[in-house]
Structure formats: structure tokens, C-alpha cells
């Protein structure tokens, strides 16, 4: 769902 996509984006930024 949309929340899953948001979590992936947040996780990506958290990996920077």
C-alpha cells in the first residue's frame, strides 16, 4: 500500500 511505499522512502533516506 501507500504506507509501505512511504516506509521504503523513509528507509532509503535513513540509509544515506
Curated annotation (Swiss-Prot):
Q: Which UniProt keywords apply?
A: Amidation, Amphibian defense peptide, Antibiotic, Antimicrobial, Secreted
Q: Tell me if Secreted is a UniProt keyword of this record.
A: yes
Compartments it resides in: Secreted
GO cellular-component term (any): extracellular region
Cytoplasm among keywords? no
The role this protein plays is: Has antimicrobial activity against B.cereus, L.lactis, L.innocua, M.luteus, S.epidermidis and S.uberis. Probably acts by disturbing membrane functions with its amphipathic structure.
In which family does this protein belong, per the annotation? Belongs to the frog skin active peptide (FSAP) family. Aurein subfamily.
| Name of protein | Aurein-2.1
Organism whose genome encodes this protein: Ranoidea raniformis
